[in-house]
């Protein structure tokens, strides 16, 4: 079972993933799972080096160079982390994945959604998420949270409000391409409320519910 998490910076994805694991372990202490992220990956040296290059404030990358780096990092991540875990029938929780790439590189960076999808399909094989959870906050809310938490720490965080507004709109466009895969959660709620909503909607999802009962 492969679940990805998407949303603007400051939406709380990383915290929510960690807290969701805790809630699921309460229900099933023997749950077999991994938590990973993109760009980079869980204990993947090569992908993490690419992540550092992409996010370095000193990096000056063209959109195509940035896209190719993301794609290379993703392929390594899939080979070394995601596919092995899925073959063992583990629950894979990933903070960002292909939908970030479609929104940021395909739409906002101007490479084209078709090009981004073609590039992605070359490397992901069958590793399409079963479920994608989108934590829904606006660009203004994202900027406020990042400023309050001082999360302006890398090249993408330091982009303008206008850039993040475009990313928000791009995400909505991406979601509309495959709406059945997405669980959209109101990110303005408290963390406990967000978690309760996610857990409720996960167990209402037939694919997740069947996996849970059989593992």
From Swiss-Prot:
Question: Which Pfam families does its entry note?
Answer: Thymidylate_kin (PF02223)
Q: Which GO terms describe its cellular component?
A: cytosol
Q: What is the organism of origin for this protein?
A: Mycoplasmopsis agalactiae (strain NCTC 10123 / CIP 59.7 / PG2) (Mycoplasma agalactiae)
A Gene Ontology MF term for this entry?
A: ATP binding
For the keyword ATP-binding, the answer is yes
Tell me which UniProt keywords the record has, alphabetically.
Answer: ATP-binding, Kinase, Nucleotide biosynthesis, Nucleotide-binding, Transferase
Q: Residues that bind ATP, according to the entry?
A: 7-14
Its Enzyme Commission number?
Answer: 2.7.4.9
- What name has this protein been given in UniProt? Thymidylate kinase
Q: Which domain of life is it from?
A: Bacteria
Please give the function described in this protein's UniProt entry. Answer: Phosphorylation of dTMP to form dTDP in both de novo and salvage pathways of dTTP synthesis.
Q: Does the keyword ATP-binding apply?
A: yes
The uppermost taxa in this organism's lineage are:
Bacteria, Bacillati, Mycoplasmatota, Mycoplasmoidales, Metamycoplasmataceae
- Sorted alphabetically, which SUPFAM superfamilies does this protein's record hold? P-loop containing nucleoside triphosphate hydrolases
Q: Which family does it belong to?
A: Belongs to the thymidylate kinase family.
Reaction it catalyzes: dTMP + ATP = dTDP + ADP
* One GO term (biological process): dTTP biosynthetic process
């Amino acid at each position: 079972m492969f679940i990805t998490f998407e949303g603007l910076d400051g939406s709380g994805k990383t915290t929510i993933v960690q807290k969701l694991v805790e809630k699921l372990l309460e229900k099933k202490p023997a749950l077999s799972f991994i938590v990973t992220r993109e760009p980079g990956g869980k204990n993947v040296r090569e992908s993490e080096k690419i992540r550092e290059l992409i996010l370095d404030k000193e990096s000056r990358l063209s959109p195509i160079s940035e896209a190719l780096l993301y794609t290379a990092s993703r392929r390594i991540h899939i080979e070394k982390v995601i596919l092995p875990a899925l073959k063992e029938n583990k629950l894979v929780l990933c903070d960002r994945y292909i939908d970030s790439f479609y929104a940021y590189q395909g739409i906002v960076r101007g490479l084209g959604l078709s090009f981004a999808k073609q590039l992605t399909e070359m490397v992901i094989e069958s590793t399409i998420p079963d479920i994608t959870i989108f934590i829904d906050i606006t660009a203004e809310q994202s900027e406020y949270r990042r400023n309050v938490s001082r999360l302006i720490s890398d090249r993408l965080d330091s982009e303008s409000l206008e850039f993040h507004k475009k990313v928000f709109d791009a995400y909505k466009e991406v979601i509309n391409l495959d709406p059945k895969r997405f669980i959209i959660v109101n990110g303005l709620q408290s963390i406990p409320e967000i978690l309760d909503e996610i857990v409720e909607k996960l167990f209402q999802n037939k694919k997740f519910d069947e996996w849970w009962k059989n593992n």
